[in-house]
Swiss-Prot record:
Lineage: Bacteria, Pseudomonadati, Pseudomonadota
Residues at which Fe cation binds: H161, H240, E322
Pathway recorded for this protein: Amino-acid degradation; L-phenylalanine degradation; acetoacetate and fumarate from L-phenylalanine: step 3/6
Protein name stated in the entry: 4-hydroxyphenylpyruvate dioxygenase
A single MF term (Gene Ontology): 4-hydroxyphenylpyruvate dioxygenase activity
Species annotation: Pseudomonas sp. (strain P.J. 874)
Amino acid sequence: ADLYENPMGLMGFEFIELASPTPNTLEPIFEIMGFTKVATHRSKDVHLYRQGAINLILNNEPHSVASYFAAEHGPSVCGMAFRVKDSQKAYKRALELGAQPIHIETGPMELNLPAIKGIGGAPLYLIDRFGEGSSIYDIDFVFLEGVDRHPVGAGLKIIDHLTHNVYRGRMAYWANFYEKLFNFREIRYFDIKGEYTGLTSKAMTAPDGMIRIPLNEESSKGAGQIEEFLMQFNGEGIQHVAFLSDDLIKTWDHLKSIGMRFMTAPPDTYYEMLEGRLPNHGEPVGELQARGILLDGSSESGDKRLLLQIFSETLMGPVFFEFIQRKGDDGFGEGNFKALFESIERDQVRRGVLSTD
């Protein structure tokens, strides 16, 4: 059921599209996240990787919108797709409300996927064919023989959320973009201050409750991690994508066994402080600590709402991935934001990117 009015008929993410200026950069990353290649495009150098209900489109097609995006930004998420009830209707409405169209070249007998210009100029596709047997993949792709079409992989189920890092002063622009076109609402607002720098984050959620996009911008001090991302990425873009698991410890063990590299674990003090922060949380602290998994949420008055999360290292330029499990908490790990922000800041100081004068 929709949380509020859903004029575009949104129904979750359909896929994220990735591209790289150098060949064979992304395939190994998909593999260490537990994804399997299940299909190849009929006429283009484009491939479908899957795990659970997550679709990753690897676009290696030369002279494509994706290849130009990757040439400018490096290996990156160069597009994303929302599921909608009626793509032509949604597309028409988006254009009437001021969205810019993006033309994607199609071959004969191929679907024309309507797309508008999204974050960093990347296409935001509107897809209404996602039923098993009649999806865009059934029409435009050839499934590989003998490969499970819905591999379980490391137990990742769906795209939980993805973030946009934006230039200072542009958070309101992007919030308005999603509000005006899709009727997103702001569900969380954070102002995270580290010792030297800070960031502001506005978490936007679609009326279907399934598409969640936190927008991040640098606070007035500058020189922090959002600024560093924007410099490295050469513009605004998707900073990380979070995948949902229903057993993060098990997922972590699987990912670790296939070569996933995780962000440096928080200091021991983080785990010593957990009981004080979340009294009677009931999670196995030793197991979490051994894996560097973070815990957040609230546990007041016996009403436990928890969230477990862990991040990969930066795997594509400054872009990384998050693996998350929700036990009643629908936030983004705000309690960990500060803890993590400070640990990233310490890392920036160590690397000499940030001066402590």
